[in-house]
UniProtKB/Swiss-Prot annotation:
Cleaved by MMP9 leading to release of free IGF2 from IGFBP2-IGF2 complex, which contributes to enhance the motility and the growth of astrocytes. The gene is Igfbp2. A motif (Cell attachment site) lies at residues 280-282. One of its GO terms (molecular function) is protein phosphatase inhibitor activity. Residues 203-285 form the Thyroglobulin type-1 domain. Multifunctional protein that plays a critical role in regulating the availability of IGFs such as IGF1 and IGF2 to their receptors and thereby regulates IGF-mediated cellular processes including proliferation, differentiation, and apoptosis in a cell-type specific manner. Functions coordinately with receptor protein tyrosine phosphatase beta/PTPRB and the IGF1 receptor to regulate IGF1-mediated signaling by stimulating the phosphorylation of PTEN leading to its inactivation and AKT1 activation. This is Insulin-like growth factor-binding protein 2. It comes from Rattus norvegicus (Rat).
Length: 304
């Protein structure tokens, strides 16, 4: 689904599959910049009351928390670290991966980006977009650039579509990319037998489930002006590894600034591992999977 992020579990799917929707996305290069606007739930009086006092340290600018948080935090200034899960850059800045980074998306996810002035090539419409970001409206835009190009994003000069359609298009492309990555193995034919076509390998259960999700996304419509996010949150996108098996850890999408719940599954069947917790964090699935394997082995020996 995604370019390689590092580690066998990350090449295809991040725990927050709606990464580009939850943090926004931009082109990484002069003249290319596309951003995703998405609608956050309104900040209720109860949520605002739970925020407590504003930061004690003097801030050049206050911004909302990452994601759809309602509380105020100090904006990151030029040269400071930035990323998906840490405070936003100030209004005139963008969060970029460091030049030459081999894993730019991973850098943004892990907070290893840097707040910089907007790079050359932004159009007047894009400047207007950045001004709207700090208004009191219901739209929130996180400026974290460097991911859209890797997912085949829009090119410079293309008229941006409506925000809801843009969200859905990015999401579809993200799942399509996972689909293509998992099918790469079947496309590399032997150089010695260029005319001999090999039958495609059988789809694994995880790949089949992904196919079904992709089909549902392709038929989604926008019935109103609320945008597609509420519909996307109801989907579970399977986290498949490069071999098409389920990754041990599966996670729901992040919502309202909170990490989604994660649980452990059998890599072959995708069924939950008994005894493993469901938590907002790392359930350390390898421990429960190893224990299950040992129990299954002991049971097999008793049967023999």
């Amino acid at each position: 689904m995604l370019p390689r992020l590092g580690g066998p579990a990350l090449p295809l799917l991040l725990p927050s599959l709606l990464l580009l929707l939850l943090l926004g996305a931009g082109g990484c290069g002069p003249g290319v910049r596309a951003e995703v606007l998405f609608r956050c739930p309104p900040c209720t009086p109860e949520r605002l009351a739970a925020c407590g006092p504003p930061p004690d340290a003097p801030c050049a600018e206050l911004v909302r928390e990452p994601g759809c948080g309602c509380c105020s935090v100090c904006a990151r200034q030029e040269g400071e670290a930035c990323g998906v899960y840490i405070p936003r850059c100030a209004q005139t800045l963008r969060c970029y991966p460091n030049p030459g980074s081999e894993l730019p998306l991973k850098a943004l996810v892990t907070g290893a980006g840097t707040c910089e002035k907007r790079r050359v090539g932004a159009t007047p419409q894009q400047v207007a977009d950045s001004e709207d970001d700090h208004s009191e409206g219901g739209l929130v835009e996180n400026h974290v650039d460097g991911t859209m190009n890797m997912l085949g994003g829009s090119s410079a000069g293309r008229k941006p579509p409506k925000s809801g359609m843009k969200e859905l298009a990015v999401f579809r492309e993200k799942v399509n990319e996972q689909h293509r990555q998992m099918g790469k193995g079947a496309k590399h034919l032997s150089l010695e037998e260029p005319k001999k076509l090999r039958p495609p390998p059988a789809r694994t259960p995880c790949q089949q489930e992904l196919d079904q999700v992709l089909e549902r996304i392709s038929t989604m419509r926008l019935p109103d002006d609320r945008g597609p996010l509420e519909h996307l949150y109801s989907l579970h996108i399977p986290n498949c590894d490069k071999h098409g098996l389920y990754n041990l850890k599966q996670c729901k999408m992040s919502l309202n600034g909170q990490r989604g719940e994660c649980w452990c599954v059998n890599p072959n069947t995708g069924k939950p591992i008994q005894g493993a917790p469901t938590i907002r964090g790392d359930p350390e699935c390898h421990l429960f999977y190893n224990e299950q394997q040992e129990n299954d082995g002991a049971h097999a020996q008793r049967v023999q």
